[in-house]
Amino acid sequence: MHRLIFVYTLICANFCSCRDTSATPQSASIKALRNANLRRDESNHLTDLYRRDETIQVKGNGYVQSPRFPNSYPRNLLLTWRLHSQENTRIQLVFDNQFGLEEAENDICRYDFVEVEDISETSTIIRGRWCGHKEVPPRIKSRTNQIKITFKSDDYFVAKPGFKIYYSLLEDFQPAAASETNWESVTSSISGVSYNSPSVTDPTLIADALDKKIAEFDTVEDLLKYFNPESWQEDLENMYLDTPRYRGRSYHDRKSKVDLDRLNDDAKRYSCTPRNYSVNIREELKLANVVFFPRCLLVQRCGGNCGCGTVNWRSCTCNSGKTVKKYHEVLQFEPGHIKRRGRAKTMALVDIQLDHHERCDCICSSRPPR
């Protein structure tokens, strides 16, 4: 096994992010790769995981791609591109039609994959993870002015051509128009190079809208009627067919049908409910000059969430709908009264009152969150 200096021209051509002169990288220059010492095997593949994180200020058009695109990419890579644009702008990503990574295992991209994440100050949303050769990933529009692209390859199989992602700046910062739900061919130009990509609806946005719609239904029958008014009964019967297509992993040898309506009702009924909660008595009563035994007691307090019980669940919180005070007998001790002239420390069994929540309600804001 030899330890060689990793030649600049090899990686500079392979680990690529190309942009026009207005898109400026903020990370260290790629020339720093001249001094990277990496082990190689006899097949000229990297044997140590190579990591690189690059930040790109998006002011125009450009692209990032897997090393050696459109040829086979190296093994053991973990490459990250963080794309930033000005406030009140968004970033659009379009995959080149030449796309191919190592195939998925059981429909899960475990080994080699490219992943896109939406980044905001409060959350990170995975827009998708792709591998294999079956289809080109859809066009993606960031929800904020930041988006992250990650490419990972393991130390086994590789594939070609890899991937190439064109990025561009969107200054409209408006919700996607209804016309963008149509399938059409979009041709753009970057530095004189044209590319074609299908214009498809962002699957994340479709799923969000569908999830909000599903929250309106309480039974499987109502849900299927909404999707297929003419054939919902047939769909309902087919759902429980004893075939691998309809049999879930939790089926095993169960003879009865799963009661989806009951599961849905349980989630709504018991997500926001009173439950055991341990409270510190001194903190609960706001008493600093006494101590108690036991120090803590169990009370019933509202807990859980309203995620599956309401339509606009992000604006809802689980709060007490009915609160009662209950007595508890505890041992109270006043540490300031120490033993003096035969007088014992002050200790006594006392009754204290603690709040218990008997009913919990989901309180929702009149305005859904942005």
UniProtKB/Swiss-Prot annotation:
One annotated GO molecular function is: growth factor activity
Q: Listed disulfide bonds for this chain?
A: C109-C131, C302-C360, C306-C362
Q: Does the keyword Repeat apply?
A: no
- Cross-referenced InterPro entries: CUB_dom, Cystine-knot_cytokine, PDGF/VEGF_dom, Sperma_CUB_dom_sf
Q: Name one GO biological process term.
A: cellular response to transforming growth factor beta stimulus
So which residues are the signal peptide here? 1-18
Effect of changing D202Y: reported as: In a colorectal cancer sample; somatic mutation
What Gene Ontology terms describe where this protein resides (cellular component)?
Answer: endoplasmic reticulum lumen; extracellular region; extracellular space; Golgi membrane
Task: Write down what this protein is called.
Answer: Platelet-derived growth factor D
The job of this chain, per UniProt, is described as: Growth factor that plays an essential role in the regulation of embryonic development, cell proliferation, cell migration, survival and chemotaxis. Potent mitogen for cells of mesenchymal origin. Plays an important role in wound healing. Induces macrophage recruitment, increased interstitial pressure, and blood vessel maturation during angiogenesis. Can initiate events that lead to a mesangial proliferative glomerulonephritis, including influx of monocytes and macrophages and production of extracellular matrix.
Is Signal given among the entry's keywords?
yes
Impact upon substituting R247A = Abolishes cleavage into active form
